[in-house]
Amino acid sequence: MFWSQSKDNIWIVGHRGVRALLPENTLISFQKAIDLGLNGIETDIHMTTDGQLVLHHDDTLERTTDGSGKIENYSYAELRQLDAGIKFSPEYAGQRIPRLE
């Protein structure tokens, strides 16, 4: 049996953090998920040209950052220059793509 009906089996997971409230896959979005008492977060991982693992849903940058192109074509230092909050709202300008540490 894979599932028994019990409240103990229910987990609430933030998809890319709390992407409806804050820029997805940013540290502030992950922290808000923790603050709200969520049981976990779901994110995606990509590798940069210098072998760093970064947290970002898309394999390209256009939708959520001020950059363009594929993550795999950037070094971590180059990605850190991009703004991962500005497209969500100017209020969140300056958010960065986080690295998996």
Specify the residue positions occupied by each region the protein language model found.
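Conserved, mostly hydrophobic/aromatic
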Residues: H15, A33, D44, L79
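Short, acidic/polar
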Residues: L22-K32, L100-E101
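Conserved beta-strand positions in the central sheet of alpha/beta enzyme cores
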Residues: V13, I41-E42, L55
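Active-site mouth loops of central-metabolism enzymes
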Residues: G14-E24, F88-Q95
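N-terminal amphipathic alpha-helix/helix-capping segment at the start of soluble metabolic enzymes
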Residues: M1-R16
